[in-house]
């Protein structure tokens, strides 16, 4: 996030329009396992981590323009619209990906 902030500021100083979007990915087995290890429900675990991440950015004077949580309804709506747009523009016969998401 620090490097992204440096690049954003450099672009702005250089006369370019630049934005920094950051946030937290709050889905997947890693979240479930970490929440279980902490003895917290996944939502509470994510709320805590998201707040820590925001505090860290503030203390480091990182100037993000957008903070996105993958559990936010606005994020879900945008992703849904994106996938619908892709589906509408996809070549005929394009199949669905079925596989493991976690790395």
Language-model segment annotations:
Residues 1-103:
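N-terminal, positively charged nucleic-acid-binding surface of large information/translation enzymes
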């Amino acid at each position: 996030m620090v490097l992204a902030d440096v690049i954003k500021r450099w672009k702005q100083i250089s006369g370019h329009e630049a934005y920094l979007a950051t946030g937290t990915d709050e889905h997947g087995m890693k979240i479930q396992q970490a929440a279980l290890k902490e003895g917290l429900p996944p939502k509470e675990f994510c709320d805590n981590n998201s707040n820590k991440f925001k505090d860290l950015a503030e203390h480091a004077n990182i100037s993000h323009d957008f903070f996105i949580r993958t559990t936010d309804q606005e994020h879900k709506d945008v992703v849904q619209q994106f996938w619908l747009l892709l589906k509408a523009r996809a070549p005929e016969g394009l199949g669905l990906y079925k596989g493991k998401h976690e790395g």
